[in-house]
Amino acid sequence: AFTGGQIAKWMYTHHVKQIDEMTNISKNNRAKLAEAYTIGCNEAIDAQHSKDGTIKYLFPTHDGKFVETVYIPENDRATLCVSCQVGCKMNCLFCQTGNQGFEGNLTATDILNQVYSLPEVDKLTNIVFMGQGEPMDNLDNILRTTEILTADYGWAWSPKRITVSSVG
């Protein structure tokens, strides 16, 4: 038999991309899982590299829209700015996202995909909710995401490594 804890550990600790990589689950149970589920990793469809090492990725969402995610490497840290909405309702003067209009909230799965599918995932030291969208306008999915990022069954990150940036 297998447990949710085993599956979560493979996904969030070992970052497997295929169910077959979960080697402490029997082949029979892996086959059953693979028939019913996929891990759901959506690779970035575009990446723009800057001279300072920053990389802006374009990730697809579950409903065929796209969001930007920015990876920022520094000397002793690597930060990921994740999006929580497609577009934004706030229309802040300093931000171009509001000019796109608002198309919807990202699910926790869409937000986590930006982390999980990042080629540099093993280098990350910090995550900032400061991409497209206003986190407080999508609070339920922000809370689900931060729970998985900080829970023992998830990524087990310290909450100090996660920042939620808000206009309000």
Q: Can you name each region flagged by the protein language model?
A:
Residues V67-G168:
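Conserved Radical SAM active-site core
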Residues A1-A78:
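Flexible, acidic/Gly-rich N-terminal and inter-domain linker regions that tether
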